[in-house]
Swiss-Prot record:
Keywords: Amino-acid biosynthesis, Cytoplasm, Diaminopimelate biosynthesis, Lysine biosynthesis, NAD, NADP, Oxidoreductase. GO terms for biological process: diaminopimelate biosynthetic process; lysine biosynthetic process via diaminopimelate. Pathway: Amino-acid biosynthesis; L-lysine biosynthesis via DAP pathway; (S)-tetrahydrodipicolinate from L-aspartate: step 4/4. It is an enzyme of class 1 (oxidoreductase). This is 4-hydroxy-tetrahydrodipicolinate reductase. The gene is dapB. It comes from the Bacteria. It comes from Helicobacter acinonychis (strain Sheeba). It holds the Pfam family DapB_N.
Amino acid sequence: MKIGVYGASGRIGKLLLEELKGGYKGLVLSSVFVRQKCEIDFSSFSHKPLVTNDLKAFVRACECVIDFSLPKGVDSLLDTLLECPKILVSGTTGLEEKTLEKMQNLALKTPLLHAHNMSIGIAILNQLAFLASLKLKDADIEIVETHHNLKKDAPSGTALSLYQTCAKARGYDEKNALTTHREGLRSKESIGVAALRGGDVAGKHTIGFYLEGEYIELSHTATNRSIFAKGALEVALWLKDKAAKKYEINEIFD
């Protein structure tokens, strides 16, 4: 399957290119979208991709777009994909509601998956979080996430996704149960989400379930960002030949 990388100059974009250098389980890098002059050397790649700032040409040259860009860039990508539907794997976080609506419209035409975290371990953590939230009905739930000091969004999209999982399991109102800043006593039907920023931490997420006399913590730590690139490529393989729909990363394990 031909892969197009959107956001190639970013941290994960560069790792995607590295994974695709010699091909990845039958996936071939066919196109790379760049807004400015590309300084990437593709001479060692098994297949030389189309490198372009023409969004339509970029999309036409591939069968699946993998997006790790910025929120403002996803809108124009979706507009092009709505005209020329291709499989989409998107790991861009911080998207506005109007952008998510466009994504839902695209899902009527092609299979796509948008996840705040492409790590397989985080997908499993989500499932464990749902089970623990359901079974430990009296436990207070608190989520803590830690990332490098250059991360722009806080809390992280992954932490918010874990929050949504826990809130759904408990039947909480997702809009009102979230607490990112606390003063005074803790509200019973609330879930705290705290964000720590420092150094070069790739990502750590911990969910605590606090009971009287004991507590359980579920934690995931990313020690290498390559897991996000490999996870996105595995998602692309999984989406191949799937029906048009917006899929969730947890469905990979169903």
